[in-house]
Amino acid sequence: MDNNLTVADNKTISVVSNHELGELIQPLIREIHLFDTYVAGTTHLDDPSVLKTITVGEELVLRREDNPFDRKAILVLNSAKQKLGYVPERDNIVFSRLMDAGKILKVKIKGIKEQDSFTRIEISIYLVDL
């Protein structure tokens, strides 16, 4: 399963605004804040140096993953498509359903806290309402 429905660098919005109806549609586009959570699994990365490249306010990418351990798994990737971790399993059921239904989700880094060998990435998840 490779559903990758996100807004990265406002590409979706720019496609709409370049359309002849873009000026009418653009004011209707809004981001609805859904939830704050964190990125799970940051201690299990193959390349933990990727955690040094992220910044507060950065937009991340969500991608559904075909995962035998969690049927609702959602990968969290940086803009270069490098794995940062997952939306926590306890939080992913609604977001996976939205993504599977074709909804566009946007993620922003809200905070980064380094604790010993653990990096906690706090994120905000938004629904892009077109």
Q: Model-derived features: where do they sit?
A:
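Conserved active-site motif detector
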Residues: 1-130
